[in-house]
């Protein structure tokens, strides 16, 4: 808006920059774009500003769906693929919000089918793995931040913590500002070892350096939101190395989300230093690719 025409018309930008960089991986065009925008971008990287921070170790932890959970996932994938393959381009464009809702339901099955199916009595591979990680961490004297996009999933995990005799705090969007700050102060000072936080409610503005383990229960389209959540523990005042676990349902859409995050983040960071999920801008074939499952 301040410099109209600086990056040409969209058609010219698409032909000279976007397609060569995004589709063809043209390094020369990428460097050309970098040179053009570098004078207008101010980046402050935590690794450069806070060189005395302890290490941050990130690990993807995979859980394999089995039994009834796997059957429900496969059935939902097949239904979505049949729906997408039968749509015209016009229908696809007009129904992207509904398609995104279906993808969200698929992610919920990965988390725990009980989020969708009230009568579900089977297991959740990720919930079992998450509880094992938390129990081991608490047993070793660590404090844990547990993030999920789904508040209903946090409630199910909290029930598991209660059953295991592990104390916790719970922060969702329904918690008022005063109560929120009270919980933050208490967690940093007392012996309660787990803080369950919805990603949207607690992704920014909290200082929780008493924790040195962060668990992301479900990957989200926007990796920047997850990074901001991790930074509730990995920030000024942190004295210990921070271990970050990202739980992923193996051979599912969650693996595809992580790959998409990495690809989008790599491209965006090369240009500006930020990343964002672009699910609503996907083409039908790209969405179908998200649903593909490797052959056993």
Regions found by a protein language model. Give the residues of each.
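Generic recognition of well-ordered alpha-helical segments
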Residues: 2, 32, 36, 40, ...
